[in-house]
Amino acid sequence: IDSFLDANLVFSREHQVYILSIESLSEYTYDRMRSAYEFYLDGIESALSKSEYISGNDLTLADISYVCDFSQFLREGKYQEILKNQGFKIISQDIKDTHPKSINHLLNLSELKEFSSIMGSYLDWYKN
């Protein structure tokens, strides 16, 4: 779990910089975020190919942290026009094809009462 949480912190730092600068995004920041996204989700895909949850066969802090932090990153979907006007696309737009285990895990967990009672309809635009 510790190594996942370390990777999660790095990803979270990158997505905070990305989201906070999204209205005047540099190519450097966008490319950094894209690299962090791919590295992070490649790790999630690998973990989920071995077990039902990120860190084994039971729900752990790794899964909870993933839902919270990755959902925050997905706010980029609300900035599609702003990104497009700057010549960028939503980094996560192909997630269902490139990282299907990751998005399915997120959406499945978000349906659990413990998550849905807090998240509400936050992820609805990714469910289609």
Predicted features and spans:
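Short active-site alpha-helical segment characteristic of glycosyltransferases
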Residues: Y66
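All-alpha amphipathic helical-bundle segments outside canonical DNA-binding/catalytic cores
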Residues: R32, S51-A62
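C-terminal helix/juxtamembrane-tail motif
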Residues: G120-N128
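Short His-centered aromatic/hydrophobic patch
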Residues: D69-S121
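Alpha-helix C-caps/helix-loop-beta hinges
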Residues: K50-S51, L112
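A structural signal for short, well-ordered beta-strand segments and their strand-loop junctions
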Residues: V10-R13, Y53-S55, S117-M119
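Conserved C-terminal alpha-helical bundle
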Residues: I1-K50, L74-N85, K89-I91
